């Protein structure tokens, strides 16, 4: 027996009703009777629809994967060799798969990675997969940028938040000029 909870009414239904599709028609379809659907009022005119079949659903989202193209994604084990021991400056971008602003600046970062070529190495570090680095460098907002030169953080190089490609270029050029790598 299922219930539909509205702002002031509870209805009990035990009769069979037409089925409801539980996924998009482009994928395999599992059909559930409408009687297995529970609607709960969350706020005025907003409803949360949940299936009470007891089965757990998982969904893979291709948009949640960070694709780096020319930018290498590194972890804690590669940080020392890639960033601290690098002969050239390294711009580290801390990102997360769930971070909207990180996804927003992705094309600009890719373009700048190609543009700077051998003057600058750009790497990404996943926030969720590398908690020790996040704590060590006190990363509180995403995306978060830190420039490293000769194994040390360049003073004043920290920046966080999404910015335009032009502003990113201005930021990087300013940093490279301050460490005499232009």
From Swiss-Prot:
One Pfam family matching this protein: Thioredoxin
Transit peptide endpoints, chain numbering: 1-67
Keyword Disulfide bond attached: yes
Cysteine disulfide links: 99-102
Protein location: Plastid, Chloroplast stroma
Record site feature (Contributes to redox potential value), residues: 100-101
Residue numbers annotated as active site: 99 (nucleophile), 102 (nucleophile)
GO molecular function term, any single one: enzyme activator activity
Presence of the UniProt keyword Plastid in the record: yes
Organs and tissues of expression: Predominantly expressed in leaves.
Residues annotated as domain Thioredoxin: 68-177
Keywords, ordered alphabetically: Chloroplast, Disulfide bond, Electron transport, Plastid, Redox-active center, Transit peptide, Transport
Source domain of life: Eukaryota
GO cellular component, one term: chloroplast stroma
GO biological process, one term: positive regulation of catalytic activity
Record family assignment: Belongs to the thioredoxin family.
Physiological role: Probable thiol-disulfide oxidoreductase that may participate in various redox reactions.
The protein's name: Thioredoxin X, chloroplastic
Organism: Arabidopsis thaliana (Mouse-ear cress)
Organism placement in taxonomy: Eukaryota, Viridiplantae, Streptophyta, Embryophyta, Tracheophyta
The encoding gene: ATHX
